[in-house]
Amino acid sequence: MLPRNATDKIQGNVSKPCFWKSLSPGQNWKSKSMRSFPEEFVKSTPGAFEHRVVFSVRWGNSWQLWLEREEKDLFMIEEDWDEFVDDNHLGPNDNVFFRHDDKMFLEVQIFKNDGNEIIDAPPEVEPETEPFHPTTPKNSHKETTTASASASASEFSDNWRETHGCADIKNPELYLLNPKNPYFVKTLTKGNDVLYVPKTVIKKYGLKFGPHLSPMHYLLPGDKINGSTKIYGGGSAPCFNGWVDLCRKYNLKTGDSMVCELERSGELVTAVRVHFINKT
């Protein structure tokens, strides 16, 4: 556990609601008590955490965790929390700091007992590919649609998957509308609802984003999906929400790949043009 003066120093620079998690004797990171939110934290963020929460870390990864209530206590779903623990290799010498950022979003920092912060992804974690979880967990909140709308969406997505593939993309620059635009290849893995721009791409093209919550768009053939820009990690981890809506609409699955072409207005990135790759 970090010394009290170290936690006070870190927490003293934070104006938003926050809390710490570290192990007590007899606990492990997958103990049920580690999945709960402090009561004071929940009270200080009324309405922010109804059905799910999104954790973001400094190296660009994020995790969506569904929530459940037991009487007055709020817990993260066991499967989702365990995935976060495993992905970050949390151990007995780790201290995790959670800070409320906006609505259901939390910024997460991991510190060792010596006070050093973990700022790089574990070897097994790919910081430039955020995961997408296409299924809804048991007992989680479910959005409702009319029968006709549901059938129409299902027919549309099934037809799309018949004509598009997700094999490794060679020569992605050939798919760009403007060869001078920044781009990257996105492959879906497991568990998130925002689109991160790889830090290597940001650095290569000198990209700028924002301001926080400013509108942006996903551009597809004959379609436009609205989203917004999110800025985390002091500006070092920009991302776009609305990505989960695109994934659901086009029935995207784990392993699907596409080319993401970034459109700029002035100096700022304001749109992502998504190129699906036809089967050969």
Curated annotation (Swiss-Prot):
Gene3D superfamilies: DNA-binding pseudobarrel domain. One of its GO terms (molecular function) is DNA binding. SUPFAM superfamilies: DNA-binding pseudobarrel domain (SSF101936). Residues 122-153 are annotated as: Disordered. The keyword Transcription regulation applies. The keyword Hydrolase does not apply. SMART domains: B3. Residues 20-114, 183-276 bind DNA. One of its GO terms (cellular component) is nucleus. It is found in: Nucleus. It holds the Pfam family B3. Keywords: DNA-binding, Nucleus, Repeat, Transcription, Transcription regulation. This is B3 domain-containing protein At5g25470.
